[in-house]
Amino acid sequence: MNEWNKAQAGYLYDANYDREVVENRTKCADLCYEFNQCKPSDTKKQAEIIKKIIGCIKGDFVITAPFYCDYGSNITIGNNFYTNHNCTILDGAKVTFGDNVFIAPNVVFSTAGHAIDAGQRAKGLEIALPITVGDNVWIGANVSVLPGVSIGSNSTQFKSR
């Protein structure tokens, strides 16, 4: 089983030194950079680039720069998806968004977890657990969604003050 398949299966995998994993992450970083350098008025070019990044797009979407993700191929967005500035998605595992999802600025979705054992951590081993966001969800500013979390439909998530 290669490192990418280990990640998708929820096993510890080499996220830092495996050539294929690093190349895929670098390719996505280049596309995110290209997207983030677009003029805000060039929505056509932005949409073209996002369609190269995101694994599955099921309908209308707005993604406001800057936007960052690790691979993009593990991300599915439903219809009527909106994310404000500075959304970060660490998608070592699947990140699935339902329909009518609205995301405020500075939100992080992180499927990435690190090995508990210091020796494994020093080898660059990580684990990735999927994140699911249901339909009709609003996620407020500065929220961090951690590995393995599911957010139910018709809900709101916000950072307490």
Give the role of each language-model region:
Residues 1-59:
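Terminal amphipathic alpha-helical/low-complexity segments used for targeting or macromolecular assembly
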Residues 14, 144, 156:
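Short, electropositive, low-hydrophobicity segments enriched in small/polar residues
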Residues 67-77, 82-151:
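Flexible, glycine/small-residue-enriched loop-and-beta-strand segment within the central core
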Residues 155-161:
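Short, compositionally biased segments
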